[in-house]
Curated annotation (Swiss-Prot):
Name used for this protein in its record: Putative uncharacterized protein BUD26
Keyword Glycoprotein assigned: no
Disruption phenotype: Diploid deletion displays a weak budding pattern phenotype in a systematic assay.
Chain's gene name: BUD26
Presence of keyword GTP-binding: no
Length: 95
């Protein structure tokens, strides 16, 4: 619904249909990527909780923690992508 509202507002501001569809596609892609990243982090958290009780799996737990660090870096890159898309939208509205 948010995307439909955004597309409606964009059309009212005389943005071409091609630009509107590109913006909506970028936002949809961003949200789907974020949703996948959150699912992966939830699975990793679940695995950490399952293995933390077992003393033999300390090495495995450290590997998963490193994996979580990589996923956090990916989320930071995703947020940077969001800022770039937002900046591009603002620049297009100014011109």
């Amino acid at each position: 619904m948010i995307l439909i509202f955004f597309a409606y507002i964009s059309r009212r501001e005389t943005v071409s249909q091609r630009q509107t569809s590109t913006i909506v596609y970028n936002i949809t892609l961003m949200f789907s990527t974020l949703r996948c990243a959150l699912k992966i982090l939830a699975q990793i958290k679940k695995r950490l909780q399952q293995t933390s009780s077992n003393h033999e799996n300390k090495k495995y737990e450290e590997v998963i923690k490193d994996h979580v660090g990589v996923k956090i870096q990916n989320i930071i890159c995703l947020l940077a992508f969001v800022l770039v898309v937002y900046y591009q939208m603002r620049c297009k509205k100014m011109t």
